[in-house]
A protein has these predicted regions:
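Mid-domain, small-residue-enriched loop/turn segments at the edges of structured enzyme/sensor domains
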Residues: 88, 146-175, 182-225, 232, ...
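Active-site SXXK
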Residues: 99, 113-131, 227, 252-257, ...
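A small/polar active-site loop signature that marks catalytic segments
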Residues: 223, 232-380
């Protein structure tokens, strides 16, 4: 399917979600009428969508009077797809409007969630920090003469250059922060300054003991600190991730200060428990909003950013900025929002830990909460769900005959570990009914790649049928 067609379908689904927030009496008229289908392009046969693909001329807006899919019909279609000798498959499909269970395949059985766990982290961050909150990185005058304190506020998407207001990664720049600092100092620091780093907002171990050392070595994650550039990713392709991203960012900041005429004397030091006497702020830059960072985290499945946001959410509840506090606050948050947490185990906040245990039913409840809940902060997580065949971690998927019906329509968070594949999200079916779903594959003997087409086909089946 052409990218433009996928984009149009994705746009229709976005409008459909927006319509959910509009009272039915106001939305009495159809939300819109889709343009007529364009002439069929000449494309390779292998890329042609299947005959079951919903026609582009069908209005893709949720219809309050659209019939729910018949559970028996849905089971007849999904069970053959979600049956495999290679591994264990579980799943659940809910009607978004009513919460009715339309499909259940051992949905309450706990399974390893992989990066689908980031949906829990997203909800905790949005609820406890606020969608429009920005994270500040500041420079203060230290308690000792000639000393500056670089205070970390949790922004790990800092850029090395000037602040880029239109970006999420690099929204706040260290060069802009340094320029403000030099201007505030005037000519009083020509002889140099000493730079101290205050990253005391986080506590506890920087590396979670539940993470596989192979994942750390491979760069799937790095030690977690509340300050970093580019989410602690290397500047050069093939480079290694910093083992202390906060110190690396502070050293970069010191280098920039030197280039601007304020040399930093000696090595960058650390303020172990903050510097309470450092109260005069000289300069500050602010990150993209929490909602924008959550969307970036979900779209790119950014493990480091997920861990940081979860710890910040804990501090938002006056808890320590530790990994243990982060998972505890996430669990308490989703429970308070009505998610059944029976059997739910959170060992980290990114989904890398094999000790995590979440059921498909719990993911379906969480997605329903995001899509139809009345909390405006939490609803902002919708922007982070990748669109099948179009964006994020789903960009290169849904291009086969079995899955093309979901291209541009399925919006879901992906999850991948060596023997784990998961997919949780939402889709508008052919009759205009909004469905939420979670499909989970664990213990696949041939690896996670064996499970991926099964999960994608299951989600595409929801998009392509009315199932009545």
């Amino acid at each position: 399917m052409r990218r433009t067609a996928r984009a149009l379908q994705a746009g229709l689904l976005a409008l459909a979600l927006a319509a959910l927030a509009v009272p039915a009496a106001i939305n009495a008229a159809p939300a819109f009428i889709a343009p007529p289908s364009p002439p069929a392009p000449v494309i390779p046969a292998a890329q042609l969508p299947p005959a079951s693909l919903a026609p582009m001329g069908v209005a893709a807006s949720p219809k309050a009077d659209a019939a729910q899919p018949d559970p028996a019909r849905l089971a007849a279609l999904l069970n053959p797809i979600l049956t495999s000798d290679a591994g264990s498959l579980t799943g659940q499909v809910l009607d978004a409007a009513t919460g009715a269970v339309l499909y259940d395949r051992r949905a309450t059985a706990a399974a390893v969630p992989a990066s689908n766990l980031k949906l829990f982290t997203a909800v905790s961050a949005l609820k406890n920090l606020g969608a429009d909150t920005r994270l500040q990185t500041s420079v203060l005058r230290g308690s000792e003469p000639g000393t500056l304190v670089l205070r970390a506020g949790g922004d790990v998407l800092l850029g090395a250059g000037d602040s880029a207001p239109g970006a999420v990664n690099g929204h706040a720049g260290l060069t802009s922060l340094a320029q403000q600092t030099v201007a505030a100092l005037g000519g009083s620091a020509g002889g140099g300054v000493r730079l101290l780093l205050d990253d005391s907002v986080f506590t506890g171990a920087a590396l979670n003991p539940e993470w596989d050392t192979g994942d750390v070595t491979a760069g799937e994650i790095a030690p977690v600190f509340p300050l970093a550039t580019n989410s602690a990713m290397p500047d050069l392709k093939g480079g290694s991730r910093p083992q202390d991203s906060a110190l690396a960012a502070a050293q970069l900041f010191a280098s920039i200060l030197g280039k601007l005429g304020v040399p930093v004397q000696g090595a960058v030091g650390r303020v172990a428990a903050g510097d309470p006497a450092a109260t005069e702020q000289l300069a500050a830059v602010a990150s993209a909003t929490v909602a924008e960072q959550v969307a970036y985290m979900l779209q790119n499945s950014d493990n480091f950013l997920a861990e940081v946001l979860a710890r910040l959410a804990a501090t938002g509840q006056q808890r320590p900025g530790s990994s243990a506090a982060a998972t505890a606050v996430t669990l308490a948050t989703v429970k308070s929002l009505g998610v059944d947490v029976t059997g739910l185990t959170l060992a980290d906040s990114s989904g890398l830990a094999m000790a995590n245990q979440v059921s498909a039913a719990q993911f379906a409840q969480l997605v329903k909460l995001i899509v139809t809940g009345d909390d405006a902060n939490i609803r902002r997580a919708i922007d982070g769900f990748p669109v099948a065949g179009l964006s994020g971690t789903l960009e290169s998927r849904y291009d086969t005959a079995e899955t093309a019906a979901g291209s541009g329509l399925v919006r879901a968070k992906t999850g991948t570990l060596n023997v784990v594949k998961t997919l949780s999200g939402f889709v508008l079916d052919a009759d205009g009914r909004l469905l939420v779903f979670s499909f989970m594959g664990n213990n696949f003997s041939g690896g996670s790649a064996v499970a991926q087409p099964l999960l994608d086909q299951a989600a595409a089946t929801l998009a392509g049928c009315g199932c009545r």
